[in-house]
C-alpha cells in the first residue's frame, strides 16, 4: 500500500485518535496530544460522514470536557484546525475553545 504524505498524516491522526478514545473509555484523563488527536479524528470522520463545516465546528466542542483531560490541557488548546475533504472540496475546519 502506497500512501502520500498527506494520507500518512491522516492515518496517523486517526490511529492516535482511536488510542485516545480507548484511554478515555478506560477512565484515563487525556494529555494534550491525545486530546487534540481525538478532536481532530472526530472532525475528519464527521467530514467523511457528510457533515457540514458548521455542524463539525459545533459538535466538536462536545467531544471532550475539562473533566476528560489532565489539569491545564483545556486551557492549552485554544483552537483545533483540521483540513478535511468534503463532497465539494477540501476545507479547513477550525474549532475555537474545543474543551469547556
From Swiss-Prot:
List the Gene3D superfamilies hit by this protein, alphabetically.
Answer: Urease, gamma-like subunit (3.30.280.10)
Q: Which Pfam families match?
A: Urease_gamma (PF00547)
Q: Which domain of life is it from?
A: Bacteria
Q: Name one GO molecular function term.
A: urease activity
Ordered alphabetically, the record's keywords are: Cytoplasm, Hydrolase
Its Enzyme Commission number? 3.5.1.5
- Its catalytic activity? urea + 2 H2O + H(+) = hydrogencarbonate + 2 NH4(+)
Q: Name one GO biological process term.
A: urea catabolic process
Pull one GO CC term from this UniProt entry. Answer: cytoplasm
Q: Does the keyword Repeat apply?
A: no
Protein's cellular compartments: Cytoplasm
Its annotated pathway reads: Nitrogen metabolism; urea degradation; CO(2) and NH(3) from urea (urease route): step 1/1
Record-linked HAMAP family: Urease_gamma
In terms of PANTHER family, this protein maps to: UREASE
Q: How does it assemble?
A: Heterotrimer of UreA (gamma), UreB (beta) and UreC (alpha) subunits. Three heterotrimers associate to form the active enzyme.
What is the similarity comment for this entry?
Belongs to the urease gamma subunit family.
Q: What is the protein name given in its UniProt record? A: Urease subunit gamma
- The species is Lysinibacillus sphaericus (strain C3-41)
Q: Gene name, please?
A: ureA
Amino acid at each position: 500500500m502506497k500512501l502520500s504524505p498527506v494520507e500518512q498524516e491522516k492515518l496517523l491522526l486517526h490511529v492516535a485518535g482511536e488510542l485516545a478514545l480507548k484511554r478515555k473509555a478506560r477512565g484515563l484523563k487525556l494529555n494534550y496530544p491525545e486530546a487534540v488527536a481525538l478532536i481532530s479524528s472526530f472532525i475528519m470522520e464527521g467530514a467523511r460522514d457528510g457533515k457540514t463545516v458548521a455542524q463539525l465546528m459545533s459538535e466538536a466542542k462536545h467531544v471532550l470536557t475539562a473533566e476528560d483531560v489532565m489539569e491545564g490541557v483545556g486551557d492549552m488548546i485554544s483552537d483545533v484546525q483540521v483540513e478535511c475533504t468534503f463532497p465539494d472540496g477540501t476545507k479547513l475546519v477550525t474549532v475555537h475553545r474545543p474543551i469547556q
